């Protein structure tokens, strides 16, 4: 018998307590530090003192050894230990190489068998994140095909669908968590570096692949997302412009998912006060901070970013716990990491410094969890899907009463997402006499010019904008125009 199973009868009772959580948001860390047998007790002590209840750990997949559980000896010890401590474990399973799936024929099927093996080996683990930031070339390649079209979303779809079916066959109660999306992407196939895909466009591609497949069952129970700031000195609620998204832009991700999957067998995010539907697993969040001189001996290398300071991080982390608890679609929030990595070229956003000393954020997060219990301290925020183009506006000519002569009239169109437009001028009988059509880039004014010799009479401008990623969402505008003799 597998030695992890020795503890099974005891763990079932412990897991029932962990898994039976209320609607309160769970707070935890994404960190593998505790998996090491020498670190486990200290690591779990810190989590317990913080009041955290969830730990995401990474489990690699090697297509060359698809039946070998990576780091199994350490996991065999850590899984029962963490569960007995009341910590809910989440396995984040991803290919070890960026081309680990796409370069190996049949790799998606091998991956599905691998996650099923993990589920059978560790039956107390009920949460599996499939992949990690597949919209980033560091973790998934290629992102684009030779013609510039996105291909990563379609390839990832095959992986996720296969993993979903394999895990549900082992245990239907397993939470299959999709994506682990990065908050940003450039959408530029010919970029000199970081050839990445924005989260909104990745979801669009994923939905296209799903619909084209004819699948009649879901592919995920939750959506993992990493709402990092654009810059470490950004405040919590600065966020991003479309098509990227951060903490204050979760509604943008919900809308993108609705656009991609509404009307299919894949549930979308709940609307209004409903709690039924897809949920977020915000499994990586962090603001990197500078290193205090007193702890510098524990680090090496050169800093590669412009970090914030410890005081700012402490406030942001506590505010994040409270703010995200007021979104009913958020199941858990995981800080990345608990303890800094000593190499300054890597990650220093922990609640604990590399020397083991605690940052101010340790105490502020501990207090926020204790005070709120993971529940909203104020009013819950409600989301509803939109049927309109985000930020759509039309600026009409300054004068809408003009003398008859050859005129050049200009409209200015704006939107906060990419859109297509059709603009026309109609006479009093409703007949279109002029037409223009084209595209509007997000946050950039599009000037639409009409040039003609107009006859005296009454006319109407009509403009319709359609969202580029969902033509069913549209915004329409009209304005009168009078041409005098």
Model regions and ranges:
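A glycine-anchored, Pro-Gly-centered beta-turn/N-cap motif
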Residues: 444, 450, 455-459
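Aromatic/hydrophobic beta-strand junction motif of beta-rich domains
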Residues: 407-415
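Substrate-binding cleft and catalytic face of glycoside hydrolase catalytic domains
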Residues: 47-193, 230, 339-341
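Noncatalytic carbohydrate-binding groove/subsite architecture in carbohydrate-active enzymes
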Residues: 41, 107-112, 151-310
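Aromatic-rich peripheral "rim/lid" segments of glycoside hydrolase catalytic domains that contact
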Residues: 38, 66, 134, 138-139, ...
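Bacterial N-terminal signal peptides
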Residues: 7-16
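Boundary/entry segment of secreted carbohydrate-active catalytic domains
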Residues: 23-60
